[in-house]
A protein has these predicted regions:
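Intracellular alpha-helical coupling/juxtamembrane segments of multi-pass membrane proteins
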Residues: 250-275, 279-305
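ABC ATP-binding cassette signature C-motif
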Residues: 1-262, 309, 315-334
Length: 334
């Protein structure tokens, strides 16, 4: 089932086309990796999906009621709040439900007859929802996710304002996962994560029942968590089935097909141009040359295939006559 559709998406940034008349469908339960060169527009694309940025042209249709979560590592956090209070806020809707349930229980003491029956039925449904959500064991649910990302290392009683940038990133990711949105948008989620926490995140995402899109430069990570790849390249958004390695195989095949089609078109264009140049001035062939000219004008010329170049670097260095290459004291990472 489709939960989000993009039609005719076009957007420019800094006088450059990022997307041109692109279409895309996101289906329920898809695990999508978003790839492209730096500056291709990956983060812009995610921001448009999240509704944080308005596209220049085109339509983004979201399923009514779709809950979208976005990992914004530049978001401002409540500095005076504790880590646990911040994480607990992921379940604020359950706290509100519990308050409403208590209000109903209070009303029951003064109700009777049909009104009492109605309140009993309503409270039973609300109680069942709280039970099914594990409301009375939320701390355990919270720590299961947060511990997996290393939040326990800086403590649940810690004040957010005292945390480092890496610690805040882990905290925001933890809350986002706890909220379990219908569509989760992740921009470089492995930043600041240790290897053990990346491993935990891989296991979590591969078993995730809902939909997510993730931007990452970590190829090994993408290969393990993505079952679909969305590529942003040359102003086009294209969707490929499979992980990153499968995408590379399909992309290479499509690029070869495109290059062959481009070469055929260029050969045909040159052939027509040569004919027009040779026959345009002759009275006997000018009509046919003019006809070829009209055909040439109607051709939609294919864009020249881009050529990717590999870069290599070599940095000169001096050998140091010392045993201590690096000395660190009281280092704090993440």
């Amino acid at each position: 089932m489709s939960i989000l559709e993009i039609k005719g998406l076009s957007h420019r940034y800094d006088e450059r086309d990022l997307f041109v008349n692109s279409d895309l469908t996101v289906n329920n339960g898809e695990h999508i990796g978003v790839v492209g060169l730096n500056g291709a527009g990956k983060s812009t694309f995610i921001n448009i999906l999240a509704g944080k940025l308005l596209q220049d042209e085109g339509e983004v249709k979201r399923l009514p009621g779709l809950r979208i979560g976005y990992l914004d590592q530049h978001a401002t956090l409540p500095k005076d709040e504790t880590v646990m209070a911040y994480l607990r806020d992921a379940f604020s809707y359950l706290d509100e439900l519990n308050l409403k349930l208590e209000e109903i229980y209070n009303k029951m003491g003064e109700a009777d007859g049909d009104e009492l029956d109605r309140l009993i039925e309503k409270s039973a449904k609300m109680q069942q929802r709280l039970d099914d959500s594990g409301y009375y064991d939320l701390d355990s649910q919270i720590k299961k996710v947060a511990n997996g990302l290393g939040v326990n290392k800086f403590g649940y009683d810690a004040i957010i304002g005292t945390l480092s940038g890496g610690e805040r990133a882990k905290l925001m990711l933890s809350k986002l996962l706890l909220e379990e949105h219908d569509l989760t948008l992740l921009d470089e989620p492995t930043n600041f994560l240790d290897i053990e926490h990346v491993e935990w995140l891989v296991k979590y995402l591969t078993s995730y029942k809902k939909t997510f899109l993730v931007i990452s430069h970590d190829v090994a990570f993408l290969n393990r968590v993505a079952t679909t790849i969305v590529s942003i390249e040359n102003g086009q958004i294209r969707k490929f089935s499979g992980n990153y390695d499968k995408y590379l195989e399909q992309r290479e095949m499509l690029n070869k097909q495109y290059e062959a089609a481009y070469d055929r078109q260029q050969a045909e264009i040159k052939k027509m141009q040569d004919y027009i140049a040779k026959n345009g001035a002759r009275a006997s062939t000018a009509g046919m040359a003019n006809s070829r000219k009209k055909m040439l004008d109607r051709i939609e010329v294919m864009a020249k295939p881009t050529v990717e170049r590999d870069c290599s670097f070599s940095f000169p260095y001096l050998e140091l006559n010392t045993k201590d290459m690096l000395v660190v004291k009281n280092l704090k990472v993440g």
